[in-house]
Amino acid sequence: MKEKIRSFFFILGVLFPIVCQAMVATGPNSLVFKSSSVLNSLPSKDVQSVYQDRDGYIWISTRNGLFQYDGYSITTYKSNLYCPDLLTNNNIYCVAEDAQHRLWIGTYSGLNVLDKQTGQIWKIDDPEINGIGISQILVTSDNRILFATEG
């Protein structure tokens, strides 16, 4: 009988802190995540990367274009019937911002730059990287642009 009581208190001593901690974790101070209906409307759910620029905008790189989210609405950047040459490719791997507030865009087949102040996008025309996937971009503290390529 004493053995059963001892076992009961041992189990209670082990389980009680675990149960209390679980109750605290699900209490009123728990984090709650809500999905934005605007973000649910992205044409592509296949997100490659997410980047927040110095102005607070969220840039979402997908296999179907680049999307800028300002907290309320989404602006789309991708080549289409009306702007067939806007980007080297709509499959966007990554983005990074330089000191001049330009956004460097790495795609499946090249590198683009977006001037956020004018909205102008241009392609980096370099035979060494044309047609090659730019998988990562790093802007150094002295504003050098480094990028990793595929292949």
Feature names for model-found ranges:
Residues 1-151:
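Carboxylate-rich, polar loop motifs that coordinate divalent cations or form catalytic acidic clusters
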